[in-house]
Amino acid sequence: MQDLISQVEDLAGIEIDHTTSMVMIFGIIFLTAVVVHIILHWVVLRTFEKRAIASSRLWLQIITQNKLFHRLAFTLQGIIVNIQAVFWLQKGTEAADILTTCAQLWIMMYALLSVFSLLDVILNLAQKFPAASQLPLKGIFQGIKLIGAILVGILMISLLIGQSPAILISGLGAMAAVLMLVFKDPILGLVAGIQLSANDMLKLGDWLEMPKYGADGAVIDIGLTTVKVRNWDNTITTIPTWSLVSDSFKNWSGMSASGGRRIKRSISIDVTSIRFLDEDEMQRLNKAHLLKPYLTSRHQEINEWNRQQGSTESVLNLRRMTNIGTFRAYLNEYLRNHPRIRKDMTLMVRQLAPGDNGLPLEIYAFTNTVVWLEYESIQADIFDHIFAIVEEFGLRLHQSPTGNDIRSLAGAFKQ
């Protein structure tokens, strides 16, 4: 550089002092930086953005939205300034040290931001594909960003103080306890995110139920430290990511994948209405298409058993059909012939233990849809029919006395 200044002095016939030469050098570096900035940002990047917006290629639009090339351009500008500082300024001078340090800090910062943009581009592209969109990549990428920011921060500090990064890293060992306390949630969240992804425990869109945190809805975001759940009342519940590994939760995605949703509901039968069927009732019920095969086979089985016993002196020696058993058989056939009930999954009508509320008769079946509205409609239609048909079997539903029951009882006493 000094040779160049000497040649300028000889040609111009003037003497240039040190201050003037430094002003000239910094002016050249500044003008070069401005020209490079104009070329990159006003010409190259604007042209690229216009073509990306007009293009139908998704990856070009995502790159533009995340400003990946903008940050790469700033990184390139820092590299050019650093090269000029090495070329124009004498090594070891204060001006050279200051300018190269600033340029290197600039390069580190924008290189880190460029990596952040690249990760965002990968994440946005992954979310466009069904298979990759189900993975909790956001939390993993946030963890990578955190680690990258810490490493670059160490490099920048070591550059400013003029020490090796190894010295700083070795000094961090004494602060491990403090760092673990400060970065507890991010570290636990990163580990939890990897476990959730590796074990396929949770994906975006899954129906999650976690009563401890009041969460019951669809997962809309899996981050480094938190998981967001949109509840069915449209409220948002935030759950610490690590709690999904340390605590238990219910994931309904298996139900959605199976294509069938369970109906498990019981009705209470008044036990005082349970009795044997007489001949007239059997003949009337035999007209039902769903019951006819059952009544025929059951009647033959009972008659054969009674014939073998040969004793008809007491009802205790005989087998007879009951209204509750016939009703249970009817419900079983009704469900098996229902067009919206899965026949390849568990299907049964069973008695539960009787109690103060009568005899519970439970319907256990699966619908052929997992859509909530359709499921509720199918379930309601089934129980509407059950409530309406129960009296045909001489049975009564059990319920606690209502105001109407009390008024009827009071009217009976008045009479």
From Swiss-Prot:
GO CC, any one term: plasma membrane
Per the UniProt topology annotation, the Cytoplasmic ranges are 46-67, 126-148, 195-415
Q: Which InterPro entries does this one have?
A: LSM_dom_sf (IPR010920), MS_channel_C (IPR049278), MscS_beta-dom_sf (IPR023408), MscS_channel_2nd (IPR006685), MscS_channel_C_sf (IPR011066), YbdG (IPR030192)
- Which parts of the chain does the record assign to the membrane side Periplasmic? 1-24, 89-104, 170-173
Pfam families named in the record: MS_channel_2nd (PF00924), MS_channel_3rd (PF21082)
Task: Extract the GO molecular function terms from the UniProt entry.
Answer: identical protein binding; mechanosensitive monoatomic ion channel activity
Q: Which GO terms describe its biological process?
A: cellular response to osmotic stress; response to osmotic stress
Keyword rRNA processing present in the record's keywords: the answer is: no
| Top-rank lineage group of the source organism | Bacteria
Alphabetical UniProt keywords: Cell inner membrane, Cell membrane, Membrane, Stress response, Transmembrane, Transmembrane helix
Q: Where in the cell is it found?
A: Cell inner membrane
What's the protein's topology in the membrane?
Answer: Multi-pass membrane protein
The question of whether Metal-binding is a record keyword is answered with no
Q: Which Gene3D superfamilies match?
A: 2.30.30.60
Residues in coiled coil: none
Task: State the phenotype upon gene disruption.
Answer: The deletion mutant still exhibits an occasional MscM-like conductance. The null mutant is not sensitive to hyperosmotic shock.
Where do the TM regions start and end?
25-45, 68-88, 105-125, 149-169, 174-194
Q: What induces it?
A: Induced by growth at high osmolarity.
Instruction: Give the family this protein belongs to, as stated in its UniProt record.
Output: Belongs to the MscS (TC 1.A.23) family.
Q: What does this protein do?
A: Functions as a component of a mechanosensing system that transmits signals triggered by external osmotic changes to intracellular factors. Probably plays a crucial role in cellular protection against high osmotic pressure. Also confers protection against mild hypoosmotic shock. Overexpression confers protection against severe shocks. Lacks measurable transport activity.
Q: How does this polypeptide assemble, per the annotation?
A: Homoheptamer. The long C-terminal cytosolic region interacts with intracellular proteins like FbaA and HldD.
UniProt protein name: Mechanosensing system component YbdG
The gene behind this protein is ybdG
